[in-house]
Amino acid sequence: MKPVRLIRIVALALIFAFSVAAQSPSDPIREAQRLTRVAQVAQQQGRYDDAIKAYQTITVVAASSPRIAASAHLAAGNIYMMMGRFEESVTAFRKAAALDPASAEAVNNLGEALGELKQYQPALQAFQKAVALDPKYLKARYNMGVTYDRLGQMKYAEFIYRILIRDFPDFALAYDSLAVSLSKSGRAREAVPFHEKAISIAPGDPSFYFNYSLTCLMLGDVKKAQVQQQKLRALDPAMAEHLAAVIAKRQRS
């Protein structure tokens, strides 16, 4: 999910939280609603620090409404993530999860922020908790696989991706990730059909061609790698140029 879309979804969640809390109208709730609109406008205009300040003010104004305050911390955390301010996003997501312990999204996002800081074991624990809160939360389940991969636990990553493919047969990223995991484990030939399946589901994703090309190189099939590179060129010329350099280096070695 793209960061901007994620922020919009959180903003909608805030509005919903207000609608529930506003059953007992109060000045703090109305002020929080006003500040949410201020934050949304600031986000749209690219004034992210102003948006964060507005959300932080909501957490104070709506301190007596934990759900609203949690949503505000979550929104601020997502903006921090988009800005690459990962330590601050960790703090925001932790506050959101503390105020709303049932929020799988807050816990998952905490895991993503920890992952960006290369704190993979705590990140994995966060993803596992998010999945326990919501077993159907696709993003958290996928993040578990990615984190196992980063920890070098390829068998666990493979297991997660295979379960995702079983439960979500149209989830292209699971096929591609499984293919990459297999290639990294020295099983490049097994990876080929999963690369091809990922591309058949989502032919517009440049990374799928890049990864497939790398697997072809592992198999010594330079010609097929170059075919994927040419397909990639139509989608992402810069990525294709990088891949061309990788192929050329492999040919020289």
What function would you assign to each model-found segment?
Residues V20-S71:
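N-terminal leader/linker segments that initiate helical-solenoid repeat arrays
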Residues S26, A32, F210-S253:
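Terminal, low-structured helical/coil segments at or just beyond the last alpha-helical repeat
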Residues Y48-K53, T57, S71, M82-K95, ...:
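Structural signature of tandem alpha-helical TPR/SEL1-like repeats
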Residues V61-S65, L99, L133, D167-F168, ...:
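Structural marker of alpha-solenoid helical repeat scaffolds
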